[in-house]
Amino acid sequence: GVPKGILCLHWYDVCLEGEANQVGPTPMAGRHDALCAAAEMIIKVNELPDRMGGNMVATVGEIQNYPNSRNIIPDKVHFTVDIRSWDDDKALRAWDSLKADFQAIAERRGTPIRMEETWRVEHAPFDDRLVKRVLESADELGLSNYYMVSGAGHDASYMNQICPTAMVFVPS
């Protein structure tokens, strides 16, 4: 594969506060279950690319649940959100949409929420001349090639800031 560049990466931390109680004596109505709120939010993250019109990926890759006991209603959850797109503005709009969804869920479930951006790297379009030359070279050598974007972060995104850059992906 020959990527035209690297997607932007936007990382966020989300923390929810609930109310820990014993499972048995606590009625379902009125619970402030931080894990249930997080579960709803995680589904929203998974649905986000379709809602935003595609050409984007998003995931929750990390979650901590406290006290993480089978007989205690969770009172704290921390999870991460990773949004990637070729369009930086679209990724920011996607996060704004999620923030509104998350806030509504937190209010409905009585679980105060804190959200924080932890890392952002803008998309990195590679040098058109170099990318074209890599594609031409593959053709000249009779090698298959695929013009694409890189969804993973690479050092090349930083090299791209100081010099013309291109990458070659080899199937593994």
PLM regions and their residue ranges:
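A short beta-alpha structural unit
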Residues: 59-69, 79-86, 112-131, 157
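Midchain, well-structured core segments that form catalytic/ion-binding scaffolds
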Residues: 1-89
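Catalytic-core signal marking the mid-to-C-terminal active-site face
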Residues: 103, 132-148, 171-172
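Extended hydrophobic-aromatic, low-complexity segments
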Residues: 72, 90-94, 145-148
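Flexible, glycine/charged-enriched surface loops at secondary-structure junctions
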Residues: 25, 47-60, 105-117, 144-149
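Zn-dependent metallopeptidase/amidohydrolase metal-coordination segment
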Residues: 145-172
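A structural signal for short secondary-structure junctions
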Residues: 6-8, 52-54, 72-75, 107-109, ...
